[in-house]
């Protein structure tokens, strides 16, 4: 059983991962902030490698009662460093993305604590991380999109489309993906994909306020409420990414042979 003093201690994994800043309140609200060198986050090979490992650390730390996900500055995750992900046209490179990609989104979905996303601006890379949260609070400057997949020439099989399909609806998700469209926080609110839209400066404080309120409930209530809330999306991701990541890898391999279409 964790005590208040235990919760106030900083576990070693808090400083283990270069792209993720972690802080935790005395009541067990863990805030995970994506960043790159202290500024807005550019998703890269290191983050891809570390994210599933960080989530495993979070899952096994009983001091974590609520997770708040957020970005740095005026964007959640708006950029990606493609070359740092390795040569995805080769089997071993694709396998790394397959293993890490599946584990990252699945471990997030299977985390047995409530998740609140504090979306602090544009999210054009891995928006599924935010949208599968139990509560999504977005700034009025937020725009959601999927930058990498079709721009790179690969099928969106890594879980993003599964989450979009669940929270946006199948036909809307397909249209947005095909057209490489985007949608604002207000549109997401009207579609039911976002719970609250607030000014940028209020996003994280509002998320942490809500998280603090939730910690007043019994821990087991919060824990198993999260399991209940995400059991459907967890099943969908387990099924969808198993074949989806393989098909994404196939389209990535095809990039080495442009003459074949």
PLM region descriptions:
Residues 1-30, 36, 73-77, 83-84, ...:
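C-terminal alpha-helix plus adjacent terminal tail
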Residues 20, 43-67:
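A short, well-ordered alpha-helical element
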Residues 32, 69, 129-131, 188, ...:
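Hydrophobic/aromatic residues within transmembrane alpha-helices
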Residues 63, 70-103:
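Glycine- (often His-adjacent) and acidic-residue-rich active-site loop
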Residues 102-151, 182:
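Glycine-rich beta-to-alpha active-site loop
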Residues 134-157, 194-206:
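Gly/Pro- and small hydrophobic-enriched strand-loop and loop-to-helix capping segments
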Residues 134-135, 175, 179-181, 187, ...:
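Well-ordered beta-strand positions
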Residues 161-171:
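Hydrophobic, secondary-structure "cap" segments at the distal end of domains
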């Amino acid at each position: 059983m964790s005590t208040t003093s235990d919760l106030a201690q900083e576990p070693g994994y808090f400083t283990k991962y270069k792209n993720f800043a972690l802080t935790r309140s005395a009541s067990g609200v863990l805030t995970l902030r994506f960043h790159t060198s202290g500024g807005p986050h550019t998703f890269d090979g290191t983050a891809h490698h570390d994210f599933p490992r960080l989530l495993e650390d979070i899952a096994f730390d009983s001091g974590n009662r609520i997770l708040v996900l957020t970005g740095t500055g005026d964007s959640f995750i708006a950029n990606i460093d493609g070359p740092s992900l390795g040569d995805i046209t080769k089997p071993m490179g694709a396998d790394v993305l397959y293993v890490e990609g599946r584990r990252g989104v699945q471990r997030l979905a299977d985390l047995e604590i409530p998740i609140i996303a504090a979306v602090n601006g544009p999210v054009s890379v891995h928006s599924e991380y935010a949208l599968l949260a139990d509560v999504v609070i977005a700034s009025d400057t937020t725009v959601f999109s999927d930058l990498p997949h079709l721009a790179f020439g690969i099928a969106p099989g890594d879980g993003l489309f599964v989450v979009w399909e669940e929270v946006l609806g199948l036909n809307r998700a397909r249209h947005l993906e095909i057209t490489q469209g985007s949608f604002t926080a207000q549109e997401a609110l009207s579609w039911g994909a976002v719970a609250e839209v607030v000014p940028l400066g209020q996003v994280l404080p509002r998320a942490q306020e809500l998280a603090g309120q939730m910690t007043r409930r019994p821990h087991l209530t919060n824990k198993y409420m999260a399991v209940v809330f995400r059991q459907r999306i967890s099943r969908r991701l387990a099924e969808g990414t198993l074949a989806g990541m393989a098909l994404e890898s196939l389209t990535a391999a095809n990039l080495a042979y442009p003459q074949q279409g």
